[in-house]
Amino acid sequence: LIIGTSGRYEFKNKGIDVFLESLNRLCRDKNLKRDVLAFVNVPGWVGDPREDLQARLKSKDKFDTPLEVPFITHWLHNMTHDQVLDMLKYLGMSNHPEDKVKVIFVPCYLNGRDGILNKDYYDLLLGQDLSVYPSYYEPWGYTPLESVAFRVPTITTDLAGFGLWVKSLKKQNGIDGGVEVLHRSDYNYSEVADGIKDTVSLFLSLIHISEPTR
């Protein structure tokens, strides 16, 4: 399963913090049977694309040893003070081969010329199975709207204008309908993290049900 979040580097407002927390909880869930690849597509103080990663991508060999700092596609000018990297370290996430959840942090603008992915944002969005935008503050929020427009189911919150609009439709909403709107407040960070984890798990079960038997 490929999931992802994106947007400006507003660590709390965009819900990047709670997204990472949910990934950590999902990784520790013993009931998780499928691999999850989670992208954090958020432009940071980006430096150069990683030459060691470029070399591996060009090589026809297979590698079983992780690179140094196995989360990141491009070096940052503030490697020791980046909030995403700091939180991944705090959570103890490491992208070990045995981990069911692995995180890829893409800290550059996706314009098709970044030197690693060389895809624009919408190409990457189309490659995802699910998007997550757990905003703490968002007057409207185009990212979940764009996700749905590209037929990629999304998770958002009722602190985003788009999430409030979906709830106002008074129709049954949920991830099986394309949009899961989680309640978010100043005091329910942990509940939101669990809500994301549980919604991803539910989505995995829906995919399993819809898959043809072999």
Question: Where is each model-derived feature located?
Answer:
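Conserved catalytic-core segment of nucleotide-activated headgroup transferases in glycan assembly
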Residues: L1-Y122
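Acidic donor-binding loop of glycosyltransferase active sites
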Residues: Y122-P139
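Short glycine/serine-rich donor-binding loops of glycosyltransferases
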Residues: G141-P144
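Donor-sugar nucleotide-binding helix/loop cap in glycosyltransferases
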Residues: S147
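Short hydrophobic beta-strand element within catalytic cores of glycosyltransferases
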Residues: P153-T157, F162-G163
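Residue-level detector of conserved catalytic or cofactor/ligand-binding positions
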Residues: I207-T213
